[in-house]
Amino acid sequence: MGKIIFYEDRNFQGRSYECSNDNPDLQPNFNACNSVRVENGCWMIYERPNYMGHPYFLKRGEYPDYQQCQGLNDSIRSSRLLSQNLGIGTNKLRVYERGDSKGEMMEFLEDCPNVYDRFCSHEIHSCNVLDGYWIFYELPNYKGKQYLLRPGEYKRFTDWGSQTAKVGSFRRVIDIC
């Protein structure tokens, strides 16, 4: 079972709200969020209600100044607990240089801290998650905007919620939960 605690002020101060399952609308529970403590599980949090807006992945740990470490404003409006058995088994991802799974393809079974070093491009236009859950990051070394990819085909970058094809790095969820 997961557990996440949201705090209105930095360093776990101010009014708090504890959550142990999906919550499509956090707005009635607090006005702003400036620190977060994840006691159990892995979570995706979103800037807007109903799991909309930009998602951010959080693993177990403390985030005393959430805005600074994640580059967010203080607007967290929904949260989703990721399945506790993510990443059990193998992980397999195919990335493509063009949309609709066309062009050069590379298959990955492991994390990739720098897409350009492995794929000779800063852009991934489509992909196919064959097994496991993966997180795409906008920048190398697992930094910047994040996108959670579940098993399935993503014919274009907008399918995983991005506005651009820029992917700097990606990793398997198993290594971080």
Curated annotation (Swiss-Prot):
Residues 2-40, 41-83, 91-131, 132-174 form the Beta/gamma crystallin 'Greek key' domain. The keyword Repeat applies. The keyword Repeat applies. One of its GO terms (molecular function) is structural constituent of eye lens. Keywords: Eye lens protein, Repeat. GO terms for biological process: lens development in camera-type eye; visual perception. Belongs to the beta/gamma-crystallin family. Has a two-domain beta-structure, folded into four very similar Greek key motifs. Monomer. Crystallins are the dominant structural components of the vertebrate eye lens. This is Gamma-crystallin M1-1. The lineage of its organism: Eukaryota, Metazoa, Chordata, Craniata, Vertebrata.
